């Protein structure tokens, strides 16, 4: 298939696109490249691409495309809190418009990168795909709104699928340090402290970005009737941890590290555990391969290789919200998160 991947130059996209190509699919990317300066230790995969904001996508951008994988958007809760109205404009309105255009273009598969943040504040209960939504951030709410507005577009010719990713971790050419396991390992290596900004009690499901990418591939290649207008939790049911448990794993992986709690550490209102059994039952080709300990070991080795420093991961290069603020303050982005110079299309 010829697959259009929005957000292909982001944290997940730069891992997903080579996987798709290795499986024999033709890939074209679409990305505004807000994080083009955030490359970590390796080159971003070179694929034909369109440099464009998802708010500006037109029908002709889908020419020759068989399937869409939609990853683009403001990528996490702190970014969503930066400007909630803008979050809904980009993450919700532009996503629904993208799906509507894809359907009009005759595309049969639309795979949406949703999130377990849709469950929000849910306590200790184990949640499957039928659980009630309870998002607590604009980011989580925007994901719910997209799922609810794209589902009615489904018909005999258009099959949307929502993949509700657990909290991601792992090494990527566009690495993020604002994710819990990535962040804890970075603190442990650079300072000897596993720095806890919450009290460690909330539950969080986690999943490696390679396993997220495998889920996208499995959904793409599955018989249509298995994924038509369906939602799947993406991860492993065994990979639900309290944040304090993740800190203990990092402590065991990173020598001479110790766990420290911030003076103002309190409970994080985001707390949820998810049941991920459905996706492996329905899509047997999806076989997740990572767990938290192996992921922490991978991150530790990658950080050692580049001699990571605190100023690297706490500064604007890799911290998504600070990077956006830096681009705005330097005049490169306007307050609507559009490049001040005209976007260009390349390579297609």
Protein language model annotation of sequence segments:
Residues 39-40, 78-85, 121-125, 173-174:
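Conserved catalytic-core motifs of eukaryotic protein kinase domains, centered on the activation segment
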Residues 96-138:
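Conserved Rossmann-fold NAD(P)-dependent oxidoreductase catalytic core, especially the SDR/UDP-sugar
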Residues 142:
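Active-site helix of classical SDR
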Residues 148-204, 209-220, 248-253:
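NAD(P)-dependent short-chain dehydrogenase/reductase
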């Amino acid at each position: 298939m010829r697959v259009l991947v929005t957000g292909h130059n982001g944290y997940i996209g730069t891992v997903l696109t080579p996987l798709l190509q290795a499986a024999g699919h033709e890939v074209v990317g679409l990305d505004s490249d807000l994080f083009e300066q955030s490359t970590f230790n390796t080159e971003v995969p070179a694929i034909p691409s369109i440099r464009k904001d998802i708010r500006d996508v037109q029908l002709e951008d889908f020419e020759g495309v068989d399937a869409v994988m939609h990853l683009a958007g403001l990528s996490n809760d702190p970014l969503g809190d930066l400007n909630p109205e803008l979050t809904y404009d980009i993450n919700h309105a532009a996503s629904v418009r993208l799906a509507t255009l894809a359907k009009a273009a005759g595309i049969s598969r639309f795979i949406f990168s949703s999130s377990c943040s849709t469950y929000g504040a849910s306590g200790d209960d184990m949640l499957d795909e039928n659980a009630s939504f309870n998002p607590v951030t604009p980011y989580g709410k925007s994901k719910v709104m997209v799922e609810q507005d794209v589902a009615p577009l489904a018909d005999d010719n258009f099959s949307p699928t929502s993949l509700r990713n657990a909290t991601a971790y792992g090494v990527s050419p566009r690495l993020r340090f604002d994710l819990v396991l990535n962040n804890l390992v970075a603190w442990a290596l650079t300072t000897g402290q596993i720095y806890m900004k919450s009290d460690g009690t909330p539950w969080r499901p986690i999943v490696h970005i390679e396993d997220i990418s495998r889920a996208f591939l499995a959904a793409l290649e599955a018989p249509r009737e298995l994924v038509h207008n369906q939602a799947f939790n993406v991860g492993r049911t065994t990979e639900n941890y309290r944040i304090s448990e993740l800190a203990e794993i990092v402590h065991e992986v990173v020598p001479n590290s110790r766990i420290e709690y911030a003076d103002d550490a309190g409970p994080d209102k985001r707390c949820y555990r998810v049941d991920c059994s459905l996706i492996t039952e329905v899509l047997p080709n999806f076989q997740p391969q990572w767990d938290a300990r192996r992921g922490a070991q991978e991150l530790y080795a990658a950080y050692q290789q580049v001699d990571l420093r605190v100023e690297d991961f706490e500064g604007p290069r890799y911290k998504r919200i600070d990077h956006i603020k830096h681009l705005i303050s330097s005049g490169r982005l306007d307050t609507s998160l559009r490049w001040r110079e005209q976007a260009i299309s390349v390579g297609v």
